[in-house]
């Protein structure tokens, strides 16, 4: 009995040490592996497995997901690819897959989503070139051309985050090499300028009666009746 108790004590001590060495769920351990919660269910065929005595997130092939030199989730790496969170689920058929050892957001075809730079990078990328004439490659970063997500560009178009899902049939599409929010018809949503064009979310003109005065609603109808009576 004493031998059994001693073995149990040693095993408990080893388990305690192993647990202490494990990173908290949601963090990366000293080897850059993503620590998961075994009680959670993860998307994209990923699972929480015990590896080296710690619960680690593994991909569909059972390999641990490494952070290594990957960009932080929500940022772009040095190749302009969007870094994602392997524990999150993404819209529009997008998914978070391990590419070259890093969790990257890929489209429905499994190709990494690349931030547009104004030039085509060839096969295997999802960069979209503009229908306008080709421009020389910029030596600056791609972010210098596109407005930050949540801001408007110089043309008043809303810059969006390709990893987000937007309501009312709106989608985030790459137009003129920048991610822009589009309405259900695929047209960019433009910030209202008061020009009264009535397109792309701009306000329409109010009815004009008489010498340029602006009347709306019932007042416009009354004014029209008065003019007709005269």
From Swiss-Prot:
<keyword id="KW-0732">Signal</keyword>
<dbReference type="GO" id="GO:0005773">
    <property type="term" value="C:vacuole"/>
</dbReference>
<protein>
    <recommendedName>
        <fullName>Vacuole-localized protein 4</fullName>
    </recommendedName>
</protein>
<keyword id="KW-0926">Vacuole</keyword>
<feature type="signal peptide">
    <location>
        <begin position="1"/>
        <end position="19"/>
    </location>
</feature>
<comment type="function">
    <text>Vacuolar protein required for aerial conidiation and conidial maturation. Also involved in blastospore production and cell cycle. Plays a vital role in the secretion of Pr1 proteases for cuticular penetration and hence contributes significantly to host infection and virulence.</text>
</comment>
């Amino acid at each position: 009995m004493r031998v059994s108790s001693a073995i149990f004590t040693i095993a408990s001590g080893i388990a305690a040490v192993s647990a202490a060495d494990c990173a908290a769920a949601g963090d990366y351990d000293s080897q850059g592996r993503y620590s998961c919660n075994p009680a959670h269910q993860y998307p994209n065929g990923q699972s929480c497995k015990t590896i080296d005595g710690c619960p680690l997130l593994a991909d569909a092939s059972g390999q641990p997901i490494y952070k290594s030199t990957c960009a932080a989730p929500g940022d772009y790496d040095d190749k302009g690819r969007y870094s994602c969170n392997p524990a999150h689920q993404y819209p529009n058929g997008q998914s978070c897959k391990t590419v070259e050892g890093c969790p990257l957001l890929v489209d429905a075809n499994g190709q990494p989503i690349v931030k547009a730079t104004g030039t085509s990078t060839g096969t295997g990328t999802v960069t979209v070139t503009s229908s306008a004439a080709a421009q020389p490659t910029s030596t600056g970063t791609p972010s210098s051309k596109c407005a930050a997500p949540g801001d408007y560009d110089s043309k008043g178009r809303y810059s969006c985050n390709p990893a987000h899902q937007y309501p009312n049939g709106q989608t985030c599409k790459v137009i003129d090499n920048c991610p822009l929010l589009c309405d259900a018809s695929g047209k960019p949503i433009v910030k209202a300028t008061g020009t009264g064009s009535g397109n792309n979310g701009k306000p329409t003109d109010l009815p004009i009666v008489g010498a340029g005065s602006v009347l709306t609603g019932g007042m416009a109808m009354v004014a029209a009746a008065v003019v007709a009576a005269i």
